[in-house]
Amino acid sequence: MISQQSAKHIENQWLALEIGNSRLHWALFMGESLEFTWDTEYLPESVIQQLGNGETKLEVGSEEKEIFFTFFPLPPAPCPLPLFIASVVPQQTVLWENYLNVRVITLDQIPLNNIYPTLGIDRALALWGAGMSWGFPVLVIDAGTALTFTAADGGKNLVGGAILPGVGLQFASLGQQTGQLPQVEMEAIKSLPPRFALNTTEAIQSGVIYTLIAGMRDFTEEWLSLFPDGKVAIKGGDRILLLNYLQALYPDLAARLIVEPNLIFWGMQTIVAGVA
């Protein structure tokens, strides 16, 4: 039997799901409050069906995994929490269409001006979340599978941005698409490599890291020259790694960056508040 207090918690709860290029990123909200976040690998269709039935202890292979335990009681089946999705992987989006209480957030729901049709929903939501949290104008750096720069001016107009391979993707492409270059693992890099390296592994590290940091510096300085009072926020799985390198090389510039991994979720929250 669910108490009135628990029922109130349940009524205000909803899930946000960002379907990224390599993983699923989750958030549990209590109304407008972000309670906590977690990541999972892509889930099998059978597990998605269990979630859609309101189950929280999921059978994944031979193991029972409590993927969706929370600090608040979850509703019993068949009443799954409302689920709002932002996806950059259409094949994954389709798998969630049978979830009983799902809404997919689309570009036309984001109140940015000058959006072009192929702008990634992740970039748009992160930009909107940053602007609504810290104000416009704002530049968002997303250090994920791709390293992206996305900016909006004080009138909430999309200024534009840029996309390039992220640090892991650059290492992987050199290791996989060349005949003799080794695969460099990011975990093996403990500090900045020598800029002029005397072995192949460190030469790859130097080339990738210093050019990425130079790109971050160039885009950030150009942005701040256009909008001296503008904000710069960084998110993404490699944010700490790249921010540490930027701090070591350009500490004054690094100090201008706002580190916030949940920009997309904050963007989703403002959209959900308007449609729920």
UniProtKB/Swiss-Prot annotation:
Quaternary structure, from the entry: Homodimer.
Pfam families linked to this entry: Pan_kinase (PF03309)
Annotated binding of ATP, by residue: E18, I19, G20, N21, S22, R23, L24, H25, T145
Cofactor(s), by name: NH4(+); K(+)
UniProt name for this protein: Type III pantothenate kinase
Annotated Gene Ontology cellular component terms: cytoplasm
Alphabetically ordered keywords of this record: ATP-binding, Coenzyme A biosynthesis, Cytoplasm, Kinase, Metal-binding, Nucleotide-binding, Potassium, Transferase
Enzyme class (EC, first level): transferase
InterPro entries: ATPase_NBD, Type_III_PanK
Function of the molecule: Catalyzes the phosphorylation of pantothenate (Pan), the first step in CoA biosynthesis.
Reactions mediated catalytically: (R)-pantothenate + ATP = (R)-4'-phosphopantothenate + ADP + H(+)
